[in-house]
Amino acid sequence: VAEVLGGEVGFIEPRIADHYCTGGDRAERKYHYEGALDCRAMAEHYGGDLLCQYGCLGLGSCVENCNFNALSMGDEGIPVVNPGACVGCGSCEEVCPSNVIELHSLTDRLLHFRHDHECVPPCTQLCPAQINIPAYVDFAAKGRYEESLNVIMERNPLPLICGRVCPAPCEDGCRRVDMDDEPVHHNYLKRFVADWDMAREDRPIPTCLPDTGKRVAIIGGGPAGLTAAYFLRRLGHSPKIYDAKPELGGMLRYGIPEYRLPKKVLDFGINDILRMGVDVEYNVALGGDFSVAELEKDFDAILMAMGAWDNSSLRCEGEDLDGVWKGTEFLQKRELGTHLDLTGKRVVVVGGGNTAMDA
């Protein structure tokens, strides 16, 4: 067909309808509307009846305008998208006067960072990964665990691990504290969904875009390097990790003990990323076994993800004496099997945080 039309064959990334509004029937109204049941007609009256200028007006004009039955109005009064039926025609986007519903590609979603018009809740604002926490909690509550997991994995590829070791800053900002004296335990829900995924047999590989032909070298196989490899692979690039250690994981493996993060769980999470098509070279260190100049010959980009292995100094006399170890140094030696004979000896642990308690 392309030859007949004089064009070229190429790949255009598909886009499907999506929206950010979660208000629906719960949203506050500024007047009672009794006009034509069309969002565009309502918008002509002072921008609609919502106090929120960015919210879904809820009359379903987008649903009426969809010719592929890809949209329906949900119980909350906001449109629900069926990704399998959406063809990305854009007819819903055209008739939405509030610009709530838009076409987004996989790249759009993976590279998205919050915008000021998106009414981001306090929990998501405090989440370092910017996970859409209300969405995955809602899916989990309805038993739609795979959809819950997909929401998490668009921002965080290591839910098995974070579900066990994340300090959960999101819960500090949970509005339920003001109502029930206790936050929604988002992190436990994340762990539950990830454990459910770990237990099932037929587990799909996350959707990846077609190969771009671009190769990226990642120096370091800790959480930063693994996360970068995951997103690069999903975007169609070919990442390769170079790590100085015999196994991947970085501080997750060599700094967090078994009782908090079982190695079986860690390995499962790492292998989930590797099976997407990520190459690895172990026991090689930058500056000794290879150089940046050598990598530049074979790769289109290089990512430095060596991590933050240096310990904070106590800035006190005697901290460099024999027999004084920094916390992460001690944990790393123990994990690597370095002989540390402390039998019958008294040990002082300075500090009271996670590292001190692990040591």
Please identify what each model-predicted range represents.
Residues 302-304, 310-332:
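Glycine-rich beta-alpha-beta "Rossmann" dinucleotide-binding loop(s) and their flanking helix/strand
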Residues 1, 31-40, 44, 50-87, ...:
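Iron-sulfur cluster-binding cysteine motifs and their immediate structural context
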Residues 6, 13-30, 168-189, 215-226:
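Short flanking/linker segments adjacent to small metal-binding domains or redox-active Cys/His motifs
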Residues 149-156, 167-169, 189, 251-300:
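N-terminal Rossmann-like dinucleotide/flavin-binding domain of flavoprotein oxidoreductases
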Residues 160, 176, 180-214, 234, ...:
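Extreme N-terminal leader/targeting segments of oxidoreductases
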Residues 217-242, 281-291, 296, 310-312, ...:
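Rossmann-like dinucleotide/flavin-binding elements
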